[in-house]
């Protein structure tokens, strides 16, 4: 049976990658204080493409290495490799091609630092997290979350090359936001899917430490997140428009986290999971709008 374009598309986890590259795009915008030059626009577009291809490759490798686990979990049992729509060698060739194209674009037309950071993130997620951390510790998503948190820095690097300590610090603050956001986001899903993780012998926190403990950890990280998201304002990266949006978004997220301690039903964790995605997209949208469209409110 021939492999369809949709099968290859599904290997890239397009919804997940869309959120990843959106945060990279915001990083690009925030890195440029004024109107971008034509060179910055061209470099940014090529950087966006390279980061997107690398993230897609990482997703495909993750599915290749996690095929046996995916087959045991209802959430992932439909994936192309699991149901036999594609073969392992086809996934490997596809991912390899994406990596080669991505690295070529980044090295030749963007800059070496972006290529190095992007490749390191790819290895961090597709290999270190998938092969080792995911199966080794209940803190898998905390430690491994760093690889998934780097896209804003990758975007920042693409248009600037990170020439100053201020660039590194500001880009790192955006990384920190996603890093702290990842545990409550993923643990909300893990609570609902804990039986699947237990069946697949994946030591997610709800499996190893129980649901009540996980709910408390979600609240702790959500409080930390509310604090960390104030950092862009504290360093002068963002202004009152972003601050207002962040306050509202954090208030709702904190309500979800507090309500998770005594949820009304089993589905509530999935409602929080869904909101966490909206939260991150909206937060970074506020960062971008504040930076580009509303300088007069600063």
From Swiss-Prot:
<keyword id="KW-0808">Transferase</keyword>
<protein>
    <recommendedName>
        <fullName>Protoheme IX farnesyltransferase</fullName>
        <ecNumber>2.5.1.141</ecNumber>
    </recommendedName>
</protein>
<feature type="transmembrane region" description="Helical">
    <location>
        <begin position="172"/>
        <end position="192"/>
    </location>
</feature>
<feature type="transmembrane region" description="Helical">
    <location>
        <begin position="93"/>
        <end position="113"/>
    </location>
</feature>
<dbReference type="InterPro" id="IPR030470">
    <property type="entry name" value="UbiA_prenylTrfase_CS"/>
</dbReference>
<keyword id="KW-1003">Cell membrane</keyword>
<feature type="transmembrane region" description="Helical">
    <location>
        <begin position="277"/>
        <end position="297"/>
    </location>
</feature>
<keyword id="KW-0350">Heme biosynthesis</keyword>
<keyword id="KW-0997">Cell inner membrane</keyword>
<feature type="transmembrane region" description="Helical">
    <location>
        <begin position="223"/>
        <end position="243"/>
    </location>
</feature>
<feature type="transmembrane region" description="Helical">
    <location>
        <begin position="244"/>
        <end position="264"/>
    </location>
</feature>
<dbReference type="InterPro" id="IPR000537">
    <property type="entry name" value="UbiA_prenyltransferase"/>
</dbReference>
<comment type="similarity">
    <text>Belongs to the UbiA prenyltransferase family. Protoheme IX farnesyltransferase subfamily.</text>
</comment>
<feature type="transmembrane region" description="Helical">
    <location>
        <begin position="45"/>
        <end position="65"/>
    </location>
</feature>
<comment type="pathway">
    <text>Porphyrin-containing compound metabolism; heme O biosynthesis; heme O from protoheme: step 1/1.</text>
</comment>
<dbReference type="GO" id="GO:0008495">
    <property type="term" value="F:protoheme IX farnesyltransferase activity"/>
</dbReference>
<keyword id="KW-1133">Transmembrane helix</keyword>
<keyword id="KW-0472">Membrane</keyword>
<feature type="transmembrane region" description="Helical">
    <location>
        <begin position="114"/>
        <end position="134"/>
    </location>
</feature>
<dbReference type="GO" id="GO:0048034">
    <property type="term" value="P:heme O biosynthetic process"/>
</dbReference>
<comment type="function">
    <text>Converts heme B (protoheme IX) to heme O by substitution of the vinyl group on carbon 2 of heme B porphyrin ring with a hydroxyethyl farnesyl side group.</text>
</comment>
<dbReference type="InterPro" id="IPR006369">
    <property type="entry name" value="Protohaem_IX_farnesylTrfase"/>
</dbReference>
<feature type="transmembrane region" description="Helical">
    <location>
        <begin position="141"/>
        <end position="161"/>
    </location>
</feature>
<feature type="transmembrane region" description="Helical">
    <location>
        <begin position="16"/>
        <end position="36"/>
    </location>
</feature>
<dbReference type="GO" id="GO:0005886">
    <property type="term" value="C:plasma membrane"/>
</dbReference>
<keyword id="KW-0812">Transmembrane</keyword>
<dbReference type="InterPro" id="IPR044878">
    <property type="entry name" value="UbiA_sf"/>
</dbReference>
<dbReference type="Pfam" id="PF01040">
    <property type="entry name" value="UbiA"/>
</dbReference>
